[in-house]
């Protein structure tokens, strides 16, 4: 079964994220459990936790259908020790918040070397950051997102994801989230069914589908291989409809959150309905 949704706002309380997801007929959703542009947040109250869990139960969302995202400020591969420690502490806090909320996944961007250390050293720092966080938490899987490769961001090659996973001690609590816009901008073609087959054959060989714990379904304003991260609505730009139809018809993408981060929230309900319909359309050639 496909779990299809969007990254919804938690404004006014975390429980509102589940309510907003239900309003667009989503069977999955993503959210921030704190302000994503601030380092610190007040601890979760018992009331907030209880209300969130109650809303998820009311609208039939299990932890397998929810893909929280951490703060954009965190850089688990930071070259400077003091800044790295700050990011690690913030990431542990994000993992602990997920633990408190009964969530089992935390999606994050891997990190950036800032042109100060090698890619290899940065990837090793990211893996060690994950190890530290896993050691201090229980039940939450660290889900590494591929990136478009803007600036010095790592994670734009499948090999980067594989290297991080290789350095994580508890392989049962690490996974990946593939963002279609990021992959396309990083040079993984998705414009035709044949290109989708090739890209995900590479993914299967280098990373492995057993580590796929979520996806972000976004078309790309950015051009192929541009290393620029610019999302668009499904079928409206450089990737086109075929990739998303192909994903909907492949059972390797069952049972994980498939999350829209497309640019127009007003049409998320339409995009979700379209994605659901593709599961029973004539198979992509």
UniProtKB/Swiss-Prot annotation:
Binding site for Zn(2+) 2: 145, 179, 216, 261
A Pfam family of this chain: AP_endonuc_2
Cofactor: Zn(2+)
Molecular function terms from GO: deoxyribonuclease IV (phage-T4-induced) activity; DNA binding; DNA-(apurinic or apyrimidinic site) endonuclease activity; phosphoric diester hydrolase activity; zinc ion binding
Reaction catalyzed: Endonucleolytic cleavage to 5'-phosphooligonucleotide end-products
Cofactor note as given: Binds 3 Zn(2+) ions.
Keywords for the protein's UniProt record, in alphabetical order: DNA damage, DNA repair, Endonuclease, Hydrolase, Metal-binding, Nuclease, Zinc
Name of the protein in its database record: Probable endonuclease 4
Native species: Shigella boydii serotype 18 (strain CDC 3083-94 / BS512)
Lineage: Bacteria, Pseudomonadati, Pseudomonadota, Gammaproteobacteria, Enterobacterales
Gene: nfo
């Amino acid at each position: 079964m496909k779990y299809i949704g969007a990254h919804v706002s938690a404004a006014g309380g975390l429980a509102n994220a589940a309510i907003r997801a239900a309003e667009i007929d989503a069977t999955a959703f993503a959210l921030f459990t704190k302000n994503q542009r601030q380092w610190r947040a007040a601890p979760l109250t018992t009331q907030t936790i209880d209300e969130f869990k109650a809303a998820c139960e009311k609208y039939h969302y299990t932890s397998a259908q929810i893909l929280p995202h951490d703060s954009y400020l965190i850089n688990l591969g930071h070259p400077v020790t003091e800044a790295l420690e700050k990011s690690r502490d913030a990431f542990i806090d994000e993992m602990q918040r997920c633990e408190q909320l009964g969530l089992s996944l935390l999606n994050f961007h891997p990190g950036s070397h800032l042109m100060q250390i090698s890619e290899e050293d940065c990837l090793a720092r990211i893996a060690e950051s994950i190890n530290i966080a896993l050691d201090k938490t229980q039940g939450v899987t660290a889900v590494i997102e591929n990136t478009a490769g803007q600036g010095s961001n790592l994670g734009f090659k499948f090999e980067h994801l594989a290297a991080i996973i290789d350095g994580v001690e508890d392989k049962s609590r690490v996974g990946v989230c593939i963002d279609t816009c990021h992959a396309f901008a990083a040079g993984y073609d998705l414009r035709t069914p044949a290109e989708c087959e090739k890209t995900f054959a590479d993914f299967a060989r280098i990373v492995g589908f057993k580590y796929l714990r979520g996806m972000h379904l976004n078309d790309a304003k950015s051009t192929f291989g541009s290393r620029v991260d610019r999302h668009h609505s499904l079928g409206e730009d450089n990737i086109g409809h075929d990739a998303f139809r192909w994903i909907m018809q492949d059972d390797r993408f069952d049972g994980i959150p498939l999350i829209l981060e497309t640019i127009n929230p007003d049409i998320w309900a339409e995009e979700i309905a379209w994605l659901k319909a593709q599961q029973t359309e004539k198979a992509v050639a």
